[in-house]
Structures are given as C-alpha cells and as structure tokens.
Amino acid sequence: MYEEEKYEYICMRCGKKVRLDINEDPIRCTHCGFRLVMKPRHPVPRRYKAR
C-alpha cells in the first residue's frame, strides 16, 4: 500500500520527542495525549552584535 512515513516532532506540553506517522488521523503526543506537536528546528549559529 504505502510506506510508513515517521517524522520526529516535539510535544508543546511535555517537551518530549515523539515519532509520529503523518498518515495516521489524530496526531497526538504518545506520552501525554496533547494535540499540538511541532517539528524541531535545526540549530542556527548565533550572530553576535558588534559593540
């Protein structure tokens, strides 16, 4: 049929990293059940301001 596409998200409530299948209907945190999860950002090098 189709391959499982699992992506890593971060829960907005408990802060844990969760691997979710995006084809699954309710996208929820597997630890606390919260519905809002976000994709983690890549680390960005900081630019220091000149003084």
Swiss-Prot record:
Q: Which GO terms describe its cellular component?
A: cytoplasm; DNA-directed RNA polymerase complex
Where mainly located?
cytoplasm
**Top-level taxon of the source organism:** Archaea
Q: Which reaction does it catalyse?
A: RNA(n) + a ribonucleoside 5'-triphosphate = RNA(n+1) + diphosphate
Give the binding site residues for Zn(2+).
14, 29, 32
Q: Which Pfam families match?
A: Zn_ribbon_RPAB4
Which GO terms label this protein's molecular function in UniProt? DNA binding; DNA-directed RNA polymerase activity; zinc ion binding
- Record-listed E.C. numbers: 2.7.7.6
Q: List the transmembrane segments.
A: none
Provide the top EC class: transferase
Say if the entry is tagged with keyword Metal-binding. yes
Q: What functional role does this protein have? A: DNA-dependent RNA polymerase (RNAP) catalyzes the transcription of DNA into RNA using the four ribonucleoside triphosphates as substrates.
How the protein assembles, per its UniProt entry?
Part of the RNA polymerase complex.
Q: HAMAP family under this entry?
A: RNApol_arch_Rpo12 (MF_00615)
Name of the protein this chain belongs to = DNA-directed RNA polymerase subunit Rpo12
Write down the species.
Answer: Methanopyrus kandleri (strain AV19 / DSM 6324 / JCM 9639 / NBRC 100938)
**What gene codes for this chain?**
rpo12
